[in-house]
């Protein structure tokens, strides 16, 4: 008696957690850099180099990559002319501070896969003394513990003497797990209104309006690489240049069904900006390189035939059931959250003359369940580079955190629903209303996918059943009154006959029965 089965590749989420990690490090300025007077601008990002899982202990190893623009304490005779700006010297530091952090993710084991997503929620660089900086910040961490496994579903028994109750089950089959690095490179030329580049001072790079589509054997990732460049001109003026270039990259993956379901997460991996000569030999071109770490999955939604129950009228056998988790798609929902906020710089003594550019990031603070979906709360972080009224150093950067909240509709959620949410910036515009008041307009894209992980009983094998000496079962002919919740299949199985035999004896045209119906059953 052979059991015919089908294996279905699944990825089961076991546990997830969201937490924050604080860091506080001292940074000693290298000997080739002058003393610091004041920090003007700072920005950074988190880079994860290695993830090690030992039971429930997760070790993260990486670094905080940061950039600092500062003014030096004094200007000495003999300094290069391009290094003097309005009586102060502007210096740039780009470095990384390594870190290792231990986190606990309860419920995972050695065989599980751990996914980690990080973001830099806050970064503050302060001056301790002329040779030392304090670098403080908060890292947000998303942890997902999951296991890839094969669900073996019984589809039929290759035996004509066995009665089989067939059914259907919707499953989400994992076709491909995607993990790749997407590299982006653009070469842009300064507008004619901008002077030539003497030295790059700072660069802020981020990705916006990211979208992806699945097309049979690949995922197409499109978006816009946004960069704000601060440089020193040949006339010793600080200049800013903002550029936004579109890109499109293909990520190869398994699967040949155009209707497959894709889910993709991206994280910034690196960026680099260099000044290059144009065709005339002038330093008027910028080479902008960036990389995105891509992680995701491709599923196909299938309806498979399953064997729900079986018995034999000729020999005493019974199915062996085992409880397993079956993954299915509940909903994939993408929504937009529009943000409008007016802000006032109360404590600033410098008047803003012009906003040069921005760097943005959207992070999730909390996800709460609602009646028919979830409420996503987060923060839109905007770093603004400004030209200010200051002859000593006419550039500064300030960071604003604008909260947002959006309801995402996911009807049918219950305790077995696993929901993953990704937020990213589509558009941001900062308008200067006066010298101290400005307006932030933005659009944040919120992508949510809800998977249902229900526990079901599936047949895994067939074994011999002990024979019963019950007199009712030994009787050749039985009269039976249908009880509440009775089904024709259960009655036929109990008395070792067939549904067709009961219908024929009782002159029934269907297997539909109701309580108090009277049936004559002939045991086979």
Residue ranges and their predicted role:
Residues 1-472:
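Interfacial loop/beta elements and low-complexity acidic/Ser/Thr-rich segments
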Residues 467-504, 509-524:
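Primarily a LysM-type cell-wall glycan-binding module
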């Amino acid at each position: 008696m052979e059991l015919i089965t089908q294996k279905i590749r699944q990825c089961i989420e076991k546990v997830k957690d969201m937490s924050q990690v604080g860091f506080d490090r001292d940074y000693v300025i290298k000997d080739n850099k002058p003393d610091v007077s004041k920090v003007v601008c700072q920005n950074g990002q988190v880079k994860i180099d290695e993830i090690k899982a030992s039971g429930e202990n997760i070790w993260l190893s990486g670094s905080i990559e940061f950039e600092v623009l500062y003014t030096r304490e004094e200007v000495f005779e003999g300094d290069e002319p391009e290094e003097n700006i309005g009586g102060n010297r502007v210096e740039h530091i780009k470095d990384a501070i390594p870190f290792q952090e231990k986190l606990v993710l309860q419920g995972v084991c050695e065989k599980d896969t751990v996914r980690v997503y990080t973001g830099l929620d806050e970064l503050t660089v302060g001056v301790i003394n002329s040779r030392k900086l304090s670098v403080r910040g908060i890292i947000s961490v998303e942890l997902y513990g999951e296991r890839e496994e094969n669900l073996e579903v019984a589809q039929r028994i290759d035996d004509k003497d066995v009665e089989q109750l067939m059914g259907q089950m919707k499953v989400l089959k994992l076709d491909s797990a995607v993990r790749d690095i997407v590299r982006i490179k653009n070469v842009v030329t300064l507008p004619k209104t901008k002077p030539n580049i003497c030295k790059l001072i700072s660069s802020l790079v981020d990705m916006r309006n990211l979208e992806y589509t699945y097309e049979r054997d690949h995922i197409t990732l499109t978006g816009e690489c946004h960069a704000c460049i601060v440089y020193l001109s040949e006339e010793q003026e600080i200049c800013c240049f903002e550029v936004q270039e579109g890109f499109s990259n293909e990520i190869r993956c398994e699967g040949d069904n155009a209707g497959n379901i894709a889910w993709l997460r991206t994280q910034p991996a690196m960026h680099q900006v260099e000044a290059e000569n144009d065709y005339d030999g002038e330093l008027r071109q910028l080479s902008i390189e960036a990389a995105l770490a891509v992680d995701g999955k491709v599923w196909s939604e299938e309806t498979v035939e399953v064997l729900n129950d079986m018995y034999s009228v000729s020999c005493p056998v019974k199915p062996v059931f085992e409880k397993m988790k079956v993954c299915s798609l509940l909903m994939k929902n993408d929504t937009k959250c529009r943000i409008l906020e007016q802000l006032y710089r109360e404590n600033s003594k410098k008047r803003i003359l012009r906003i040069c550019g921005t760097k943005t990031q959207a992070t999730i603070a909390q996800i709460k369940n609602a009646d028919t979906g979830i409420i996503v709360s987060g923060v839109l972080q905007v770093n603004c580079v400004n030209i200010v009224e200051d002859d000593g150093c006419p550039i500064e950067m300030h960071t604003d955190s604008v909260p947002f909240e959006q309801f995402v509709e996911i009807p049918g959620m219950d305790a077995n629903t696993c929901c993953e949410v990704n937020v990213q910036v589509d558009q941001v515009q900062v308008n200067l209303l006066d010298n101290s008041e400005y307006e932030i307009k933005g659009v944040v894209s919120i992508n949510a996918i809800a998977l249902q992980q229900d526990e079901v009983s599936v047949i895994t094998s067939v074994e011999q059943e002990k024979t019963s000496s019950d007199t009712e079962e030994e009787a050749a002919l039985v009269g039976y009154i249908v009880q509440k919740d009775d089904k024709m299949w259960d009655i036929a199985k109990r008395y070792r006959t067939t549904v067709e035999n009961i219908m024929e004896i009782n002159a029934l045209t269907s297997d539909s029965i109701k309580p108090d119906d009277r049936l004559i059953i002939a045991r086979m």
